A protein has these predicted regions:
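Bacterial signal peptide processing site
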Residues: 32-35
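N-terminal secretory signal peptides that target proteins for export/translocation
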Residues: 1-12
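Tryptophan-paired
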Residues: 62-115
Length: 174
């Protein structure tokens, strides 16, 4: 009799353990809100390059600048290289300053010519979630530029956030 009681008790304990494991699994799955935090919660300014006029560097409707481009972001008189010696670039994904309301981007071309693009923007603090914290979005309010190889620049989508859309169109003269 004792053996049968122990076997029943063991089965009851096994059932209770399995029930607890299943409840814990369900509870853990319910707690996961599938938060997908962007790396460093950084929103990037996406600049698409276009050619002015006809170009042999357009393949399937996408223009690629044929030479080397280095892009520097100037903040408080200091420069940081944000894109180094890109060859065949068709788009740029560049960080935006949290503290300034105008970013100064210096484009250095391989032939020694430089251009400067001034991106005026407002900063918009954005609460992502308790897991991800805060992020900074930006609203582009204006563009100015030098005219060495940059022919013109246009705002395509003024809101710079986590979405992968083109914010600025930059028209280059070859």
């Amino acid at each position: 009799m004792t053996f049968i009681k122990r076997a029943k008790a063991s089965r009851s304990l096994l059932k209770a353990t399995m029930a607890i494991i299943m409840l814990l699994t369900l509870a853990m799955a319910a707690c996961d809100n599938c938060t997908d935090c962007n790396i460093n919660n950084v929103s990037y300014n996406r600049i698409q390059l276009y050619s002015v006029g006809e170009s042999e560097n357009i393949v399937n409707g996408v223009y690629s600048y044929p030479d080397t481009i280095t892009v520097k972001l100037m903040i408080n008189g200091r420069d940081s290289i944000v894109a180094n010696r890109l060859v065949g670039a068709s788009e740029l994904q560049l960080p935006v300053s949290y503290t300034n309301e105008c970013d100064t981007l210096v484009f250095e071309y391989s032939d020694g010519i430089d251009d400067t693009l001034y991106v005026e923007h407002s900063n918009i603090p954005y609460f992502v979630s308790t897991d991800c914290g805060m992020a900074m979005f930006h609203h582009v309010t204006g563009l100015r530029h030098t005219r060495n190889l940059i022919d013109s620049a246009a705002i395509n989508e003024p809101l710079i956030n986590f979405d992968w859309h083109e914010n600025i169109k930059l028209y280059i003269v070859e």
